[in-house]
Amino acid sequence: MAVACECGMEERAEKVMERARVPKRYEHCDFESFSTDLEDGKTWSAQHEQALKQAKMLTQAFVRDYPATEKGLLLIGPSGVGKTHLAVAALKELVRRGHNGLFCDYRELLKEIQASYNPSSESTEMGVLEPVRTAEILVLDDLGASKPSAWVLDIIGLVLNARYNEKRMTILTTNYFEETATPEPVPRLPGGQRMVVKEDTLADRIGARMRSRLYEMCRTVEVHAPDFRRESRQVGRARA
């Protein structure tokens, strides 16, 4: 009986994971495989290694405390430091424990909605948004990746406000920090002037109102480390 019960639980978890729509690239991601090791004898600086360990620890703490925890996670950092790895690891562990979740790529979501406007499409805007708005646990990957037009801001507002009002748990990843460091000037232009390019903040990409809303919805975890994919040459090993 115990064996049959365990098999049934595993089968259910597999079906729930299929519905979670985790991309094949990230199917291997779990906490055990999240490593701060580099190859070829390379090492992180103490600061970078501590940042990665702290991000892992906080994500694991979120999973351990769920559903008692009141806030989701906002994982902030440059490309290649493991934000998506940690987000998927959290989702997979919660699914294993019997919860329901959904992985959603920010840009792909917007493309699906735009495609629904085609008269020949069988889907609708609300049909695309409904599972994203109502999932028990949502991983929204690469927040702010699309240029913030009025339409984009309206869509992200619909999603985040709906989840906020219903107290649904959300894990987000983004490459955009709260504030950008003082930008370095580019070489001098003709005439001796220098042009300084300011990088966008998260508020620039999703709007000040939604950034404020995320303070209430999520605990911010900043991962300050170089791009893992550039630092490590191990074949087949990738982070996002």
Tell me the role of every PLM-derived stretch.
Residues 36-73:
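Pre-Walker A (pre-P-loop) alpha-helix and adjacent loop at the N terminus of AAA/AAA+ ATPase modules
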Residues 85-99:
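P-loop NTPase Walker A phosphate-binding motif
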Residues 135, 142-144:
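Conserved Walker B
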